[in-house]
Amino acid sequence: MILDRIMKTKYLQEPSGPVNILAVADEEVPKFHEKHDKYKKDEYEGIDLILSCGDLSYHYLNYIADVAHCNVYNVFGNHDELFPEGEPLGCIPIDGKFIVVKNIRILGLGGSMKYRECKKHQYKEEEMVKRVKKLRKSIDKAGGFDILVTHAPAFGINDGTDLCHTGFKVFKELIDEYSPKYFIHGHVHQNYGKFPKITQYKNTTIINAYRYHKFEYVFDEPEGL
């Protein structure tokens, strides 16, 4: 897809400096949590944006947002239920949404492949396709997106062989069509098998956020704008 540069500049008025991002998913990390003596506040030093790929508790997300002094943008995992006390303070749900934060266009799609009836945040492939279709207008209006945040991986790219951990084909189609800088997911725990932390697929860096991963988002220089 050829990006509409005029529409893109409407959303990204001018390039910003690098954005330091913390991505988290699936399993709580002792050094980030108040219950552990090894917790160090400097773990959050310089973090500008936090992305949660799901399956983390209310209190963990609430604590991270509070100590880091920045919002946590989260999608749901297949083990998540609706938070009993409402959305954690400092957390902004982006599941099924397209948003722009710090000049970064972010698309959020939580949940896993449907493997059990009567469970929330599980979808058949065709159901996920419908979710994506609802967001197409917003995506195209913005000239694409920069980061895809999901719980499940993309089909055929570091996904599992069982139904639960099979990735979505539509995620791969989104990457092929829009070439985002990053695709960040969780769900396939690295202790389940030899799943790499970082993979390069075409122009997209894929990050398995299991537990956590820190990285720096650097803006491209504008081309002839």
Stretches found by the model and what they are:
Residues 1-64, 136-144:
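N-terminal active-site segment of His-dependent metallophosphoesterases
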Residues 2-18, 98-102, 123, 174-178, ...:
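Binuclear metal-dependent phosphoesterase catalytic core
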Residues 18, 46-48, 68-71, 88-90, ...:
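Short glycine/proline-enriched coil/turn segments at helix->beta-strand junctions
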Residues 23-25, 49-55, 73-78, 94, ...:
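Active-site neighborhood of phospho(di)ester-bond hydrolases with catalytic His/Asp-centered motifs
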Residues 24-32, 76-166, 211:
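Conserved catalytic scaffold of divalent metal-dependent phosphoesterases
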Residues 33-38, 56-70, 81-91, 159-161, ...:
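Metal-dependent catalytic neighborhoods of phosphoester/phosphodiester hydrolases
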Residues 48, 69-74, 87-97, 201-209, ...:
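Active-site regions of enzymes building and remodeling cell-envelope glycoconjugates
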Residues 68-79, 168-171:
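A short, gly/pro- and small-residue-rich
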